[in-house]
């Protein structure tokens, strides 16, 4: 059994009290991060099914295809409705009030 004087001396040693736990944290964190970063490299090496790959290539969305979809849309008939503030009644501002639903007269 270790003498009480030796235990007291070990408790007062700052290297053992602060340095060893810090060293364990750094080394343990390094191994932990290595495991998490390995997941990224494992995910890259996984090959997907060729049928699924063909399906993904067929459904590829490009900027030009999205532009063609909205090119003929009309954006003239919309109304800007302000959202309610925390102290205001949302029923009045979200278009449920008949006065706000009246069309503009030009």
Curated annotation (Swiss-Prot):
Binding partners and assembly: Associates with the MITRAC complex. Interacts with MT-CO2/COX; specifically interacts with newly synthesized MT-CO2/COX. Interacts with SCO1, SCO2 and COA6.
Region: Disordered, residue numbers: 81-106
Coiled-coil regions, chain positions: none
Organism superkingdom: Eukaryota
Membrane topology, as annotated: Single-pass membrane protein
Key words of the record: Membrane, Mitochondrion, Mitochondrion inner membrane, Transmembrane, Transmembrane helix
Membrane-crossing segments per the record: 16-33
Protein name, entry field: Cytochrome c oxidase assembly protein COX16 homolog, mitochondrial
InterPro entries according to UniProt: Cyt_c_Oxase_assmbl_COX16 (IPR020164)
Residues in compartment: Mitochondrial intermembrane: 34-106
GO biological process: mitochondrial cytochrome c oxidase assembly
Alphabetical list of Pfam families matching this protein: COX16
Protein location: Mitochondrion inner membrane
Disulfide cysteine pairs (residue numbers): none
Keyword Transmembrane helix appears in the UniProt entry: yes
GO CC annotations on file: mitochondrial inner membrane; mitochondrion
Segments in the Mitochondrial matrix topological domain: 1-15
Similarity section: Belongs to the COX16 family.
Function: Required for the assembly of the mitochondrial respiratory chain complex IV (CIV), also known as cytochrome c oxidase. Promotes the insertion of copper into the active site of cytochrome c oxidase subunit II (MT-CO2/COX2). Interacts specifically with newly synthesized MT-CO2/COX and its copper center-forming metallochaperones SCO1, SCO2 and COA6. Probably facilitates MT-CO2/COX2 association with the MITRAC assembly intermediate containing MT-CO1/COX1, thereby participating in merging the MT-CO1/COX1 and MT-CO2/COX2 assembly lines.
């Amino acid at each position: 059994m270790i003498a009480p004087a030796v235990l007291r001396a070990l408790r007062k040693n700052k290297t053992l009290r602060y340095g060893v736990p810090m060293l364990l944290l750094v080394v343990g964190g390094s191994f932990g991060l290595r495991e998490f970063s390995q997941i990224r490299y494992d995910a890259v090496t996984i090959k997907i099914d060729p049928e699924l790959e063909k399906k993904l290539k067929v459904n590829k969305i490009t900027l030009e295809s999205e532009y063609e979809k909205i090119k003929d849309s009309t954006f003239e008939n919309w109304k800007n409705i302000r959202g309610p503030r925390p102290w205001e009644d949302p029923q009045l501002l979200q278009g449920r009030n008949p006065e706000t639903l009246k069309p503009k007269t030009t």
